[in-house]
Structures are given as C-alpha cells and as structure tokens.
C-alpha cells in the first residue's frame, strides 16, 4: 500500500510507502496486521473480519534512542508454527496443548536494525514481545517509556478495577487487593486517578470480549 503526495506548483512528486504484514491464527479467524505507516510502528487485530483492537502504536523510548517513530518495517518475516504440550499442576486446565503461529517482525531506523516484535497468534489469543538488538558497543539499555497502546473500538465498555493509591490499606500495603469495579462502564476514565489494574476486561458490544493482561 502506498500514498502519493504531489506539490504541483514546483512539479515535485514523491511517494511514501507503508509496509504492512499480516499474521493469522491457525484457524484463520484472528488476524494481526503490523504496519510502519508514517514511520510509526503499529498493529491492529480483527476476529472474523471484525475489529477488536484498532490501529495501536508499538515502540520503545530508551536511553540510547527514541524507537517509537521514524521506524521502518523490514520486508523479510520469519514465520513458524508453534505446537507445544505442557503440564502445570496449579491451574484449572493442568494439561495444555498450545498451537499458534509465530511471526518475527524486524524494525529498523536509519538503516540499523533496532528490535524485533515477535507475535504469537493462537485460535484464542494474541501475545507479543520486543527483542532489542545491541547498538555498537552498547549491550544493554534502559527503557524509559513504552509506546505500546491498545485502542479499543468505539462503543466498547469496561470491567476494570481501579488501581489503589500507594501506601494505604492494611499495614500500608496498597496496592495489594482487588478493588470494586463497575460493569459495562464507559471508556475514557481514570479510575481513582492511578489508572487500572491488569488484567483488563472489555466488551466489544455484542461482538465479543477482549481481555488484556
């Protein structure tokens, strides 16, 4: 996909290209689209062609650079199928068979490889993480801010526990307990002024539910 821009009075014409890649769950119902439109790393998620996460930013701001903008999504994608079975004694379903599609999406800045965003998409969830690359002699960095966001579709409602203010409650241990929540509350609020506690549950109208954790 590309957008063309022209300055007619000077007869100058140039093209801005936006790279987009997609990864789907094994059953094909969940689709994640990764993009670098306008130099901004982003992703969006749909289920059965219905948006569940609108275009949302990706990226990291570190002590060695701002890697949330002026980024380019590389053409090559490493993809693989994950098929794992494991046992955990202390969960509701002790024997788990996990099948997913994995895609490694590499972002660069000024021709230098900066990080991979590694997505795993199963038939029921999406997970992703960042993998930073060393920069010259710098083998570690401090993440000062994360640009990752989650933009819900219009009309979504919330089931969120407000984060407690620190150093309160029993023996000044807050935040340490669950707090009351309001069912189907409106978006755009800030709880008690401290944000909300993960996991966060949302309803996408009559289309389904979204749990972010």
Where are the predicted features?
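Bacterial N-terminal signal peptides
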Residues: 8-13
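Short, small-residue-biased leader/transition segments that mark boundaries at the very start
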Residues: 1-7
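Boundary of Sec targeting at the N-terminus
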Residues: 18-19
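N-terminal accessory beta-strand-rich subdomains and adjacent acidic, glycine-rich linkers
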Residues: 22-213
